Amino acid sequence: MPGSPARPNFLVIVADDLGFSDLGAFGGEIATPNLDALALEGLRLTDFHVAPTCSPTRSMLLTGTDHHIAGIGSMAEAIAPEQIGQPGYEGYLNERVVALPELLREAGYQTLMAGKWHLGLTPELAPHARGFERSFSLLPGAANHYGFEPPYDESTPGILKSTPALYIEDDQFVEQLPEGFYSSDAFGDRLIQYLKERDQARPFFAYLPFSAPHWPLQAPAEVVAKYRGHYDAGPEALRQERLQRLKQLGLVAEDVQAHPVLALTQEWERLTPQQRAISARTMEVYAAMVERMDWNIGRVVDYLRRQGQLDNTFVIFLSDNGAEGALLEAFPKFGPNLQSFLDQHYDNSLDNIGNANSYVWYGPRWAQAATAPSRLFKAFTTQGGIRVPALLRYPELRRQQGQIDHSFATVMDITPTILDLAGVRHPGSRWRGREVAPLRGKSWLGWLSGETGAPHDEHHVTGWELFGMRAVRKGPWKAVYIPAPLGPESWQLYDLSKDPGEIHDLAKHEPAKLAALIEHWHEYAEETGVVLGRSPFQPD
């Protein structure tokens, strides 16, 4: 970039299942001073979109194209029979794409990673095989944050078998995690170590994808204690408090209507005192996980500041999907004996929740406190599943601090933006003798520098599909298809400029608009190779 003393560094930070309003800078009450500071020195994006779940988003982030092309057409843990063996449904980052770290390393960047991978479970599919010079990563989609695992046998539920504490450093599996291991601390430690050991003459690309605050909800007891009693009024009270702060901060419109809560669980008022206490404790632990993640982000940022590198580092933070509202015990894929197995091998008593030998999640009502005013949560193609908090800091591009931008953007834009800033050209359709997918995302460089408007105009079309859930957007108009029981199993139509909560279905009032959008979705599905199949996660 003209006038820059050196090629910029990059720090890409991903939270796992973070809700839209969890951060202080996005209306939350959780202590996140480090991310809040980045937001106040940079730019907050209020209409940033991802895939409905984790591994699809990660594949899009690192390739700039759609997850159906990149090999994660469905999550490997949830592939439908119709999808097995189909192109784009390999369950790992395939060879039809070139990964961002591969291109940056080829261009002289030092590529570093510490965090969750979820794009392949074997050494030949691990981060070091896709361009990272140094990497310490959790390979599966989740794991006990302390590395605790009871003995597994044929009775172990599928969800636990698919989420072992399987870590790899470069090309070697980690046989024994150190005493006192905690995922977020370990990722912060390792990335700082790699930054200290790096070749100072080369710019760096650092990828820091946390596995927090994904279930199982676990955090250091001293951090959990800070939130004792904070959530005793229940999720609906929290939802209203956060909505009010979102309005005060200018992140949503003053007159926004929030979508009603949709949940297969009892309302707070109908719970027993013990049930309320346990539910509130899970939220306390969740909050502590978010705070601890922020603390580790602060350690990395402080290191870069002390080294004089922060202002030459493009920092971007995002969540990989909406807040997690699933009731794990309701899904047959996770194993019909999940609850009995947890009762046998874990201690989920009130005083033990959050410790290494506990295993809990917080459910749909707390999730919808975090996704409001949007509809539903993770795994859905409604706004609650795909619209997430995102912020960036890079003084070279944004001179005004604390800005908020309501332009539409997508996770596929990150790779072309970073390549543009680094002065690296994407190879297009061929790389190292093989065909690769071109970019679908758009660079933000002109937009962020103020030279052009938003990267996606009102004619741009973006499609989504996962687990049979579908959506397509063109300008403010969005069509969405959600199967039963939490959707009508038919296409719905919304004008997000007037109805961001997806409350007022205009399908019957604007049939031509809906038909055009459905046609756009079919074009998207054909371009990307969508294969529809029933979701194994759908409740019986």
Language-model segment annotations:
Residues L23-G24, Q86-N94, V174-Y182, Y231-A233, ...:
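Active-site rim elements
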Residues M1-P8, A15, G19-F20, R44, ...:
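Long, internal low-complexity/basic segments
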Residues G28-M60, G64-I69, G108-L112, R130-L139, ...:
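Short, structured active-site-proximal loop/turn typified by the sulfatase FGly-forming signature C/S-X-P-X-R
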Residues E133-Y146, N355-I386, R398-K498, E527, ...:
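C-terminal cap/loop subdomain of S1 sulfatases and analogous C-terminal strand-loop tails that border
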